[in-house]
Every structure is written in structure tokens, then in C-alpha cells.
Amino acid sequence: MNPVITIVGRPNVGKSTLFNRLTRSRDALVADFSGLTRDRHYGKGRIGERAFICVDTGGFEPVAKTGIVAEMAKQTKQAVAESDIVIFLVDGRLGMAPQDRVIADFLRKTGRPVILAVNKTEGMQSGIVTADFHELGLGEPFPISSAHGDGVKGLIDDALDSLGIAEPDEDELANDPNRPMKIAVVGRPNVGKSTLINKLIGEERVIAFDMPGTTRDAIEVPFERNGKPYILVDTAGLRRRGKVFEAIEKFSVVKTLQAIADCNVVILMLDAQQDISEQDAHIAGFIVEAGRALVVAVNKWDGLDAYVKERARLEIAQKLRFLDFANVHPISAKKGTGLKDLFKDVDAAYAAAMAKLPTPRLTRILQEAIEHQQPKRVGMGRPKLRYAHQGGMNPPIVVIHGTSLSGVTDSYKRYLEGRFRDVFKLRGTPLRIQMNTAKNPYVDADKGKKGKKH
């Protein structure tokens, strides 16, 4: 599971700037759930090959008693409680403030690991600017500039190293055909996740159940269906009650992000009797950005009249149109209707995510697509797409080689994606297109000559 790093500090010390820098990579997952997570932002960050979940909190005043400031303090305390390590950010230009001492005292009492980062140190002598902050008693202050990126990689590397977590090769684990498929059932509260989970698993087929200990402990439920092993990655906050599981914890963004990152296929649950919410769209966005195979289950379908059903279909098509690669299944988790077809699509989505795409066939499809519709000209020339090969699985990545590929428009990439999808029948999985422009050896040679001094 990806570790959780929470950034705390008094207002205007640069927390959001650091957060944005850490989650700026291609797979950044950023959301702001108003109300649910007031002034708390969640993102998936990456430094090199090391992935983590990052939480940006509001300006922290832990002694606030009333109003919005008190609510922000409450949210920050909750964020600290569910984190693996805390980055306490202070302002190196303004120096020590009374609030910093109060926050440091609070963090010490939580028992969470803390790294003290002194921000805005660009152009300053680090030894001088960090000297005052030693009195906080949180170890050696780490000088950084979140605006310029100075020291940020070292800060995160230190944070991850201090946790003593051996980072697995996620792609290698995910692509191991001998491992059972991992499924996550996600969705906002009260859409019927625990009901569906109990129907899918079946009381007699539960093999084991691990109770959670710390924030990092995954709740995984191995089970079998039609003789095939699966692992359910829980986001519903399940607890065993006799022979069934019940959801007794409130919705957790962190658990949802961790489950999505840790699984092979996501079942996104929607409520047919309620409008698509911003929260539904955020969760769907997490899934797409993480590159996970997806099946959409629209629950509580039974008993609806034809008008309401059609309205629900149209709303999903409109508000979640970026999920057009995924199949949508009307179900009743309570009655168990529609689950057979749902699970067929879970298997099909996983197969599509793990599909092997031969280079000769990819290149042939590419050339046929170009013959049918060429990319638009850029200036005097036109991008030249020469050949394609597979660059990864789960999700499938198609790498296209050629020249002047920076001029290929997003609409043309979507056109190519559609061609590859149609031929390889890649339903249920995101498909990534990457452009790889060939280097010009003559240009590189000229640059080398210009750089030499005689």
C-alpha cells in the first residue's frame, strides 16, 4: 500500500506549493471534497519510482475553539491521525513563530513520525536559516524550496526511508499472472458497497479476513468465484459481524486511494436513485488517472420506472463521459440481480488491462489509421508517426515513434486510441498513448561542437 504523507504548518508557509510540486506527475490524483474534507486535499505523488499519497491541510491553529478555523484544525488532526509520516513545514524567511511551537507540541503528542522542513530557503545559507528551528526538538531541520524544488526529492526520500518500507515493483506484482486478481469496490457512502461485497463473496466462500491494525494495514478478503481465486481490497471500512461484513466506518479518501492503487480492477458503485455527485466524479477521476481497469455498477435499479432508468443512463453518459471505455451494469446488490454479467466484465476488463499487443500488429494499425486520417500540419510540416510498440500493461501503454510528434493533437491521440481499442477489443481499461520523438544525431553533434572550447 502506498504510504501516506501529510503536510502541516501554520498558514502561508507554502504547504500547497509543496503539495502541487509533489503531485504534478502524470498520475497525480488531486481532489478537494468540500464539506467532507474541508480544506484538505489528497493527491498521489511520485518521486522517481517511489509512489505515495500526499495530504495537504489547511493553515493549522490547533488551539482554535470555534468557527471555520476550528473546523480546519479538526480536519488537520484527522489527517495527521491517518498518516504514516508528517512533514511539518515552517517559513525560513519569517523565522520562528509562536504558532510553530504550539504545532510542534501537538505533533510530539500524536506519536507520528515527523520531519521538520524549513521552506523558502532559496538564496540563503541553510545553516543560518535553520538554526532557530532546532529548539522545536523535532530533529535536524531540512532546508527546502517548494517553489523552486530545491531539496524536495531529498526530503521525500528521507521521509520514505524513515518508514522502513521496502517499495515493491508495483507493475511487476500487478502483472504476475500467478497472483489472484485484486478487486476494489469503491463509491461514496451508502451506495451499497458492503451489500455487494457480501453478495460477491458469499458467506461460505470467505477464506480469511485480516482485521486492520495501523493505517497501512490493508483489509484484504480472499475469496473464490466459479473456482477462481480473487482478493477483495476493502474501502468500505468493513468489520466481521457473525457471517457477514458491515460497513461501520465513515468514507475515507485515503482508504479509497490506497485501494485503487493496490488493485487490478475497480468496481465503481453508483446509486440509481440519486444524481451523480461531484464526489462520484472525483472517485472516477482517481480511477482513470491511476490507470485501473474499471466496471461501473449502478445499484438499486430494481423497482425504478422506465423514465427514471433512462434519466439515470443519460446522466451517467453526460457527467461521467470520460468513463466511456468502461461497461455500465444496472444491478441490485440486495437481490443479487445483474451480478453474473458484472463479474464477467470484471474478468474481461482485467484481461484487457493485461493484454499483450504485438509490435507488428500495432504498427500496421497505426499505418492504417494514418492512411485513413493524417495528423494535422504543424507549420510547414506534418508529424511523422513511423511505428508503435507496447510500453507497459495494467494499463496498456502504446509508444509511438517518429518525428515532430510534439505537434500531434490530443484529438488525434484520441482517434488513434479508438483505433487500437476497436482492433484489440480493449473494453474496460484505460489506454495510454505515449509519443517518442527520435533524436536527430546531426543536431546533437552540432550542439556538442558548439559546447567545446578551443
From Swiss-Prot:
Species name = Polynucleobacter asymbioticus (strain DSM 18221 / CIP 109841 / QLW-P1DMWA-1)
The positions annotated for binding GTP 2 are: 187-194, 234-238, 299-302
> Where do the KH-like domain residues begin and end?
355-439
Listed under GO biological process in this entry are:
ribosome biogenesis
Task: Output this protein's name.
Answer: GTPase Der
Q: What InterPro entries does the entry give?
A: G_ENGA, GTP-bd, GTPase_Der, KH_dom-like, KH_dom-like_a/b, P-loop_NTPase, Small_GTP-bd
Where do the EngA-type G domain residues begin and end? 3-167, 181-354
Cross-referenced HAMAP family, in alphabetical order?
A: GTPase_Der
**Chain residues that bind GTP 1:** 9-16, 56-60, 119-122
Q: Which UniProt keywords apply?
A: GTP-binding, Nucleotide-binding, Repeat, Ribosome biogenesis
The entry describes its oligomerization and partners as: Associates with the 50S ribosomal subunit.
| Family, per entry | Belongs to the TRAFAC class TrmE-Era-EngA-EngB-Septin-like GTPase superfamily. EngA (Der) GTPase family.
UniProt-recorded Gene Ontology molecular function terms: GTP binding; ribosome binding
- CDD domains from the UniProt entry: EngA1, EngA2
